[in-house]
Amino acid sequence: MELQIAVAKVNKYAVSESGDTLEVVERPNGGLSVVLADGQTSGRGAKAVSQMVVRKVIGLLAEGVRDGAAARAASDALYTDKHGKVICTLNIVSLDLQSRTIVLTRNNPSPLYICQGEQIDKLDIESVPLGVSRDVRPLITELPIQPELIVVNKTDGLVHAGERRGTPVNVGEILRATLEDQAPSPQTLADTLLAQAVRL
């Protein structure tokens, strides 16, 4: 089995540091988890928030805590630390070799995309960011591990690209066009999405 992970990132215009943090952690019972958090607003304060959330989550995952429980614990910690005044989005994408599934954990209004052959599914059921209350629960989707399965995970910067000009980025259409034209590597797919967003 081969797992490929690709990341593409650019700083927000006129901001020295983004609020995004991404880490990969090995799961003690086999597999890997990719943890992506985005702190509210931008700059050092947002970065500190996303780093705190990611540290909490990867620490718990490394101890064998389930993804949903790790997300809830991170939300409670953020709510307690910031008194409910700061939010943070969170996505966890896990390859769980114990259950033989892909586990998608979302506390993020921004959708995830699942690509399998010619089929592209958008996971856009409304999800609440971390830190808004003490009882925040993530949305969890489990998929069987399959060859050529692609999970597209992103922060809201991609979603909001082009909105001010009235031409918001259409992630689904970009994915469809890229996947139809070629058999792109994960890095090519990530770079293409980012390039289209920057162009807008």
Region spans (language model):
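Hydrophobic residues at beta-strand termini and immediately following loops
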Residues: 8, 122-123
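Short, function-defining helix-loop hinge/capping sites that tune catalysis or transport
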Residues: 28, 46, 97, 117, ...
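Active-site-proximal, acidic helix/loop segment immediately C-terminal to a metal-coordinating Asp/Glu
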Residues: 42-63, 149-200
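Regulatory cytosolic signal-relay segments
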Residues: 1-18
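Catalytic core of PPM/PP2C metal-dependent serine/threonine phosphatase domains
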Residues: 47-117, 124, 187-200
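Acidic loop->beta-strand submotif enriched in PP2C/PPM serine/threonine phosphatases
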Residues: 15-32, 90, 123-169
